[in-house]
């Protein structure tokens, strides 16, 4: 019996050795009003709250809008066009001097890019496309002319 008691005492606590701790009830401390600090944000526009007054930074309005005109000759130039979109620049792409297969691949690549960036791609002419990032809004449509012509 001595050996089995040693195993029991080793693996299990005897009733005499069990300890219970009583938790002391704490009174909740009064909460202090915390002020929010301005945190840097990767977005171009962000709101800063100061003492219940809402202030919106117009930092993005200071940047001038830029548009890039491109006429790629090979598919490898599509990545450069995507880099312009990542820099919040609109890109007009003229695909008239490239083969149909290469033009289709470039349009597919740019479509994926503008989708990932939340932008838009629109056909504005025969093999001419306008790619815009999410901070640019395009108004109007020239679809009536496009429907009359035969495109890619």
From Swiss-Prot:
The keyword Cell cycle applies. It is found in: Cytoplasm. Its main location: cytoplasm. It comes from the Bacteria. GO terms for cellular component: cytoplasm. Keywords: Cell cycle, Cell division, Cytoplasm, Septation. One of its GO terms (biological process) is FtsZ-dependent cytokinesis. InterPro entries: Cell_div_SepF, Cell_div_SepF/SepF-rel, SepF-like_sf. Cell division protein that is part of the divisome complex and is recruited early to the Z-ring. Probably stimulates Z-ring formation, perhaps through the cross-linking of FtsZ protofilaments. Its function overlaps with FtsA. Belongs to the SepF family. Homodimer. Interacts with FtsZ. This is Cell division protein SepF.
